[in-house]
Amino acid sequence: MSNIYTDLSSAELVEQAISRKEGRMAANGSLVVNTGKRTGRSPMDRFIVQEPSTADAIDWGAINRPFDAEKFDALWDRVEDYISTRDRFVSHLHVGADPEHYLPIKVTTETAWHNLFGRNLFIRPERYNPADKQEWQVMNIPDFVCEPERDGTNSDGAVIINFARRKVLLAGMRYAGEMKKAMFSVQNFLLPEKDVLPMHCSANVGEDGQTCLFFGLSGTGKTTLSADESRFLIGDDEHGWGRGTVFNVEGGCYAKCIDLSQKNEPVIWNAIRFGAIVENVVIDDQDRTPDYTDVSLTENTRCAYPLEHVEKRVLENRAGEPSAIVFLTCDMTGVLPPVSILSKEAAAYHFLSGYTALVGSTEMGSSSKLKSTFSTCFGAPFFPRPAGVYAELLMKRMEEFGSKVYLVNTGWTGGPHGVGKRFSIPVTRAIISAIQSGELADVETEHLEKLNLTVPKELEGVDSVLLNPRNTWADKEAYDAKAQDLIQQFVENFKKFDVSDAIRAAGPSLD
């Protein structure tokens, strides 16, 4: 006889998870789980059902891989049959904190801990679906084994989004990040139709009520820099920007745990307590203390906690439009300056480019080897529409509100990776502080010709030598050669975009 557990509290789900041996309790009160062979996202196993209502609007390719509609229905039924004879957990949650733009979702999971993850990362509304919208169904069944020949999948696991049916199927997937990113992809497709820009960014608000956004790929500092004790957190990863508002798509945070320390990241450290989930972190067998330096299971160790675990947060989970926008890049070549001031055209150029390094990548098969990458919109794996749709919406929003945009390099200085050193968190925090206070909007600047970037000549709390990257290299000719190589990469990557001459001219130039 199977049981259906509906809308259990976090404490009840923790009880269930431990009694079912899904995880162990750590000394800090968090639930520690192991996700098995998949310790990151599996991009080759992610699909979108190809059907008439959305087929023409999706940017099909290596990221948005098509899946047959009939095969989806058959697989969904098969998974439903499998779970119908087993215990399962159901929660009713929202995706999107805006009363107009939320999606109601029914989350069904095979494990208690995946249901707790859903409760931590999605929004637990006071009242479910007050606008009586059509419900989305998310089914996450990690012990179901897909058969590629029969099911049309790529492997034994799959994440499949079906817009026509309003369904998301996760089968054979234990890594919980797939669940949140699948619903982010759904909102990334739906929100632009409503004149809302979906963004892979973190967001916080100062005492002065000014909102600041941080765009960036995994490991560039989105979560760390937005978790600022002097400011109020909106969210750490996914937001929507509509007229008059920036709202969180989520109700929790999914932070990296590698080398986590109370000194450097107190907000995250303190959030890991009872009700939080810690993924793939090794704990001491006796006293159950987590060892955040141990990466024997994966470098992509994670913690998932609800926003209620953050003391200084925006209670409404949304705020006003951003006065400052930060594009975080981790430049492993040591060529880019620590901070640049961007025009709106340059902002569009760098938003489309999404240049960074894959640092502690969240994708399966990624090792600790660093490599440069261009990830459109600073989150290419999650955006189903063509990139231009998002870039145009960004420019529109910036023009209407007058937001200032900055490119901040959290990567290397004084030489490339292996020669130079990485910017320290305190230096980056000093730069962010100058951006948020408005200091950077009114400083003496210089122009770096070939990179086509405007940088400040001096900044309080930052050694002036660091501000022009060429000055930090002992071998200036080596810097020039490295810069030329990086500029070439920018130019080559940007050839694929069909944009105005003004945007193209705002990027680095070989001339």
Curated annotation (Swiss-Prot):
It is an enzyme of class 4 (lyase). Mn(2+) binds at K181, H200, D237. GO terms for biological process: gluconeogenesis. Substrate binds at R41, Y175, K181, R302. It comes from the Bacteria. GO terms for molecular function: ATP binding; metal ion binding; phosphoenolpyruvate carboxykinase (ATP) activity. One of its GO terms (cellular component) is cytosol. ATP binds at K181, H200, G216, L217, S218, G219, T220, G221, K222, T223, T224, E265, R302, T428. InterPro entries: PEP_carboxykinase_ATP, PEP_carboxykinase_C, PEP_carboxykinase_N. Pfam families: PEPCK_ATP. Its EC number is 4.1.1.49. It is found in: Cytoplasm. It catalyses: oxaloacetate + ATP = phosphoenolpyruvate + ADP + CO2. The keyword Lipid metabolism does not apply. Its cofactor is Mn(2+). Keywords: ATP-binding, Cytoplasm, Decarboxylase, Gluconeogenesis, Lyase, Manganese, Metal-binding, Nucleotide-binding. Pathway: Carbohydrate biosynthesis; gluconeogenesis. Binds 1 Mn(2+) ion per subunit. The keyword Manganese applies. Monomer. NCBIfam families: pckA, PRK09344.1-2, PRK09344.1-3, PRK09344.1-5. Belongs to the phosphoenolpyruvate carboxykinase (ATP) family. Involved in the gluconeogenesis. Catalyzes the conversion of oxaloacetate (OAA) to phosphoenolpyruvate (PEP) through direct phosphoryl transfer between the nucleoside triphosphate and OAA. This is Phosphoenolpyruvate carboxykinase (ATP).
